[in-house]
């Protein structure tokens, strides 16, 4: 039975049982690995068959690429199709990367600092200050990227349906040095908030003073539902298109909490124009790797 369906008495009984279970665990004096976000061995075992038999027989992707060899810049069709379904985007709106979406976020900001983004008048590093809006509580690794790169962080409070959009709309419309915002739009830690439809639409309709402002949409938990009765999140890329701001968002996710965290896939999704811009620079690195 779902907790939401339990009576007060049933919830109290469940609480008492869990507290006893917790006390029993404490009494054992265990030394446990409580690393945040690390799947248990039982969860990893669920993916073993996929790993053990992935190279049985045919090694080629649907477009004839030998998957034992060098891949392709934006991912094989099967990998792109997986993320197309997860995020509701088209094949030309995704780049499949390594196993870390956080690495792709870092690379995206580094590229913006050094080269700018699509439509930039100059690289972000040419401004006296670069600022990011940081809804809090948020993900400490997002904030660590800003801290490491000297990006000023501006805290934005949360409401029950997402970040304080009145504050966000005001700040981005007034300050050209605000170049981005971090967002965890679904099941955001530690509150579990999923952005409401209104919040997503207001993000898509932002009118930032900085023409190269970007929303960093870390949709890490887009398919991580606990029950059939789960939250739903509007498609930010589609909403940005409707609002006339198709290039304003970078969306990220990965399979880290789905299969093997160290051996999964990560992705950046964005408008075709944004993706083409990223590929035009990433292509240099790929050609260098193939030449080694």
Model-derived segments and spans:
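Conserved core of the PLP fold type I
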Residues: 59, 65-211, 222-244
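Short aromatic-enriched loop/helix-cap "lid" or pocket-rim segments at secondary-structure transitions
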Residues: 43-48, 226-230, 262-264
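Residue-level detector of conserved, well-ordered beta-strand and adjacent loop positions
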Residues: 35, 157, 253
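N-terminal "arm"/small-domain region of PLP-dependent enzymes with the aminotransferase-like
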Residues: 2-74, 78, 84-85
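Walker B catalytic acidic pair
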Residues: 218-219
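Conserved core segment of the aminotransferase class I/II
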Residues: 97, 238-292
